[in-house]
Amino acid sequence: MTVQIDELDDKDLDEIIANGTLDGAKQGAVDSETMIQYYRHLFPWKYLFQWLNHGPVVTNDFAHREFAFTLPNDAYIRYLSFSNWEELKKEALNLCPSRFEVGPVYSANPRDRKTIRKSTFHPLKKELVFDIDMTDYDDVRTCCSKTNICEKCWPFITIAVQVLDICFHEDFGFKHILWVYSGRRGIHAWICDEIACSLDDRSRRMIASYLQVVVGNPQGGVRLINNLKRPLHPHLTRSLNILKSAFVKIVLEDQDPWASKEGAENLLKLLPDKDLASALRKKWEVDPERSSKNKWSDIDTVLASGSIASISPSVIAIAKQDIVLTYLYPRLDVEVSRHLNHLLKSPFCVHPGTSRVCVPIDIERMDSFNPLKVPTVNDLLQELDKNSQNDNGHGPTMETNTTENQKDNARGQSNKGHGFSTSLNPYTLYFKSFSSQLFKETVGNKRKHENLEF
């Protein structure tokens, strides 16, 4: 059970550490020593600072930012804040969190919240965030379920990102969108534009509602979509055009969800005419081996035969559009997006269950991104050791009886601080580039504002 330590003073926290009550970590994929090595040699602390601070000189965008640590024993510490990235790194090495989250910028330093009036302590701004979790597709994917993913079902996430990214740019004018793999089965979007960070809860709820199309089904089975009016909203028309091009490959071929009798019934339930459903059911009983792709085509074939007079082709066309949206439109955890004070796992954290790093993804390379090939923290440390051996001329390995300082020095020389000699390098460089572009625009906006105040 998670223990919240959100009301502790620094003195209290120091006492807990001194008494060793942070021990007793769960047996997981990543041990504390591995995490310490990762935080010391691989985590891009400086670039994380530049991303959140929007510049090289410390501002309240970083100094008044809330961080929350999840400790190895599942204790959860909120309202941490730091003056610079060195302090953040030092605390991470001290407490060795299994993960940490980023929250809003507050009106005062979160560490001082007990010494000021509650009315003066409130969140001011935070990136607008979105979360897509593969488990929300369990009713339409056949290859995996729960926390499992594979190369067949990950395209559900890929096409969802494509739909949302275009929407963020074209419908809202956002420019700086950081997509981050969650480490196991999902993806997070951080919209970092200044105007997005300043949105209040009401505005965030409106944007989340604008994007929410697929909702739960009280009766179970395939999820439903909101009652969509025709003609479709331009956002949905654009989204449908994107999704239709991927529907055959992702749904009909890779998932083949209607191959079985039970699966076929799920399709028939989504059709608005009982006579059409009955005719299709009889056809498939005669030929039960028909694939989902063939059954999808059968809808038009039976309708074109003229044997079903109770419904028009236009109604069926609309129904098929709705089915495409039901299966492929992005499924969002909207609660993540609705509130300014919501915390979200930081980029480059390590997922404790998979050991994979939560890497940022270049949107231009989203189609080729494979979550199963994302480096694990153990892979990265092995790469560092191998590179340190090469750099030192067959120097000491992690298996020899060298001291920890010798190992650290070897790793540090090879790593140059941010894992540039490992497979984390492309993700780190992309994050650096993203942060630099965000900083340039932030500075440009400030200069424009200053020029207007003459």
Curated annotation (Swiss-Prot):
<feature type="binding site">
    <location>
        <position position="133"/>
    </location>
    <ligand>
        <name>Mg(2+) 1</name>
    </ligand>
</feature>
<keyword id="KW-0464">Manganese</keyword>
<keyword id="KW-0862">Zinc</keyword>
<feature type="compositionally biased region" description="Polar residues">
    <location>
        <begin position="389"/>
        <end position="404"/>
    </location>
</feature>
<dbReference type="GO" id="GO:0005658">
    <property type="term" value="C:alpha DNA polymerase:primase complex"/>
</dbReference>
<feature type="binding site">
    <location>
        <position position="133"/>
    </location>
    <ligand>
        <name>Mn(2+) 2</name>
    </ligand>
</feature>
<feature type="active site">
    <location>
        <position position="131"/>
    </location>
</feature>
<feature type="binding site">
    <location>
        <position position="133"/>
    </location>
    <ligand>
        <name>Mn(2+) 1</name>
    </ligand>
</feature>
<comment type="function">
    <text>Catalytic subunit of the DNA primase complex and component of the DNA polymerase alpha complex (also known as the alpha DNA polymerase-primase complex - primosome/replisome) which play an essential role in the initiation of DNA synthesis. During the S phase of the cell cycle, the DNA polymerase alpha complex (composed of a catalytic subunit pol1, an accessory subunit spb70/pol12 and two primase subunits, the catalytic subunit spp1/pri1 and the regulatory subunit spp2/pri2) is recruited to DNA at the replicative forks.</text>
</comment>
<feature type="compositionally biased region" description="Polar residues">
    <location>
        <begin position="411"/>
        <end position="420"/>
    </location>
</feature>
<dbReference type="Pfam" id="PF01896">
    <property type="entry name" value="DNA_primase_S"/>
</dbReference>
<feature type="binding site">
    <location>
        <begin position="182"/>
        <end position="188"/>
    </location>
    <ligand>
        <name>a ribonucleoside 5'-triphosphate</name>
    </ligand>
</feature>
<feature type="binding site">
    <location>
        <position position="150"/>
    </location>
    <ligand>
        <name>Zn(2+)</name>
    </ligand>
</feature>
<dbReference type="GO" id="GO:0006269">
    <property type="term" value="P:DNA replication, synthesis of primer"/>
</dbReference>
<feature type="active site">
    <location>
        <position position="133"/>
    </location>
</feature>
<keyword id="KW-0548">Nucleotidyltransferase</keyword>
<feature type="binding site">
    <location>
        <position position="144"/>
    </location>
    <ligand>
        <name>Zn(2+)</name>
    </ligand>
</feature>
<feature type="binding site">
    <location>
        <position position="131"/>
    </location>
    <ligand>
        <name>Mg(2+) 2</name>
    </ligand>
</feature>
<keyword id="KW-0639">Primosome</keyword>
<comment type="similarity">
    <text>Belongs to the eukaryotic-type primase small subunit family.</text>
</comment>
<feature type="binding site">
    <location>
        <position position="131"/>
    </location>
    <ligand>
        <name>Mn(2+) 1</name>
    </ligand>
</feature>
<dbReference type="GO" id="GO:0006270">
    <property type="term" value="P:DNA replication initiation"/>
</dbReference>
<dbReference type="GO" id="GO:0005737">
    <property type="term" value="C:cytoplasm"/>
</dbReference>
<feature type="binding site">
    <location>
        <position position="133"/>
    </location>
    <ligand>
        <name>Mg(2+) 2</name>
    </ligand>
</feature>
<keyword id="KW-0479">Metal-binding</keyword>
<keyword id="KW-0804">Transcription</keyword>
<dbReference type="GO" id="GO:0003899">
    <property type="term" value="F:DNA-directed RNA polymerase activity"/>
</dbReference>
<feature type="binding site">
    <location>
        <position position="131"/>
    </location>
    <ligand>
        <name>Mg(2+) 1</name>
    </ligand>
</feature>
<keyword id="KW-0808">Transferase</keyword>
<keyword id="KW-0460">Magnesium</keyword>
<keyword id="KW-0240">DNA-directed RNA polymerase</keyword>
<comment type="subunit">
    <text>Heterodimer of a catalytic subunit spp1/pri1 and a regulatory subunit spp2/pri2, also known as the DNA primase complex. Component of the alpha DNA polymerase complex (also known as the alpha DNA polymerase-primase complex) consisting of four subunits: the catalytic subunit pol1, the accessory subunit spb70/pol12, and the primase complex subunits spp1/pri1 and spp2/pri2 respectively.</text>
</comment>
<feature type="binding site">
    <location>
        <position position="333"/>
    </location>
    <ligand>
        <name>Mn(2+) 2</name>
    </ligand>
</feature>
<feature type="short sequence motif" description="Zinc knuckle motif">
    <location>
        <begin position="143"/>
        <end position="153"/>
    </location>
</feature>
<feature type="binding site">
    <location>
        <position position="131"/>
    </location>
    <ligand>
        <name>Mn(2+) 2</name>
    </ligand>
</feature>
<dbReference type="InterPro" id="IPR002755">
    <property type="entry name" value="DNA_primase_S"/>
</dbReference>
<feature type="active site">
    <location>
        <position position="66"/>
    </location>
</feature>
<feature type="binding site">
    <location>
        <position position="333"/>
    </location>
    <ligand>
        <name>Mg(2+) 2</name>
    </ligand>
</feature>
<feature type="region of interest" description="Disordered">
    <location>
        <begin position="385"/>
        <end position="420"/>
    </location>
</feature>
<dbReference type="GO" id="GO:0005634">
    <property type="term" value="C:nucleus"/>
</dbReference>
<feature type="binding site">
    <location>
        <begin position="131"/>
        <end position="133"/>
    </location>
    <ligand>
        <name>a ribonucleoside 5'-triphosphate</name>
    </ligand>
</feature>
<dbReference type="InterPro" id="IPR014052">
    <property type="entry name" value="DNA_primase_ssu_euk/arc"/>
</dbReference>
